[in-house]
Amino acid sequence: MKIKDRMTHNPITVDVSLPIPEAMKLMKSGGFRRLPVLEHGKLVGIVTDRDVREAMPSDATSLSIWEINYLITRITVKEIMTKAPVTIQEDGSIERAALLMLEHKIGGLPVMSGANVVGIISVTDVLWLFLERAKRDGISGEEEPLIGAR
């Protein structure tokens, strides 16, 4: 099966200059865990909810809430994003996407059509496909779990 058949189409993308609080709002309102980052229309990175959380000051900080807000609004996604993210072309296979995500220990991939971001494929998308195929093949999921099986 091709990536384009399972991906989330037309993902929300952000510019490198977007402040972290704005990225947080987009992620929260849209239920996204990752946002492709563009500079002059070209993919240059990906920012995840984890990147955003790690950029926040710890609870043990001695900064006041006003100082924290001041600093956070000046940090952009460019400063915390993963640069040159692993991508896959839309005509690639789901199996290849799964392998890339496993090899790189990531939860999703920007999907490209040439140099343009046209989608996102995630581990969740792959798992849904797996469950749909299992159901189609008559596997109910009621069997004993295979603890530690790979």
Residue ranges and their predicted role:
Residues M1-N10, T48-V86, A98-L102, S122-R150:
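Tandem CBS (Bateman) regulatory domains
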Residues V14-G31, L38-E39, M81, T87-K105, ...:
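The conserved cystathionine-beta-synthase
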Residues M27, L35-D51, M101, L109-T124:
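A glycine-centered beta-loop-beta connector
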Residues K28-P36, A55-P57, S62:
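Short, charge-rich amphipathic segments
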